[in-house]
Design a protein with these regions (language model features):
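Oxyanion-hole/transition-state-stabilizing segment in secreted/luminal serine hydrolases
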Residues: 1-2, 28
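Well-ordered, non-membrane alpha-helical segments in soluble/globular domains
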Residues: 3-7, 43-44
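A short helix->loop->beta-strand "cap" motif at the edges of active sites that frequently abuts
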Residues: 17-20
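Structural beta-sheet core signal
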Residues: 23-24
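Catalytic His-Asp segment of secreted/periplasmic serine-dependent ester chemistry enzymes
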Residues: 27-104
């Protein structure tokens, strides 16, 4: 997959220079005009890579924070106004999910 290959390239180059790389998962986007099932499959694959590869120095799971548990391809209604972008409450939840120790 080109996205994961791109991540691996960036990770290797950055870490070779002593730069920490923090991965952040991709949030749901089913209501976007460009949504496709293939895109969702890719999003899930990228998120699995970010969460489980061990290649990042840390991970922030924005997907887990904002997704609707009853419909995981959607952002929780309380966290969005357009079903695609987080609103202030969504961004607040995302910010609160960041472990600042990742940056030390």
């Amino acid at each position: 997959d080109k996205i994961i290959s791109g991540y691996r390239n960036i990770i290797a180059r950055a870490q070779a220079k002593g730069i920490k790389i923090i991965g952040a998962t991709l949030t749901p986007f089913e209501e976007a005009v460009y949504y496709s099932e293939e895109g969702e499959v890719q999003r899930q694959a990228v998120n699995r890579f970010i969460r489980n590869s061990g290649e990042f120095d840390g991970v922030i799971d924005f997907d887990a924070v904002v997704r609707d548990p009853s419909n995981p391809k959607h952002i929780l209604p309380a966290y969005t106004e357009d079903n695609l972008h987080p609103n202030n409450a969504g961004y607040k939840a995302m910010a609160e999910a960041i472990d600042l120790n990742l940056f030390r």
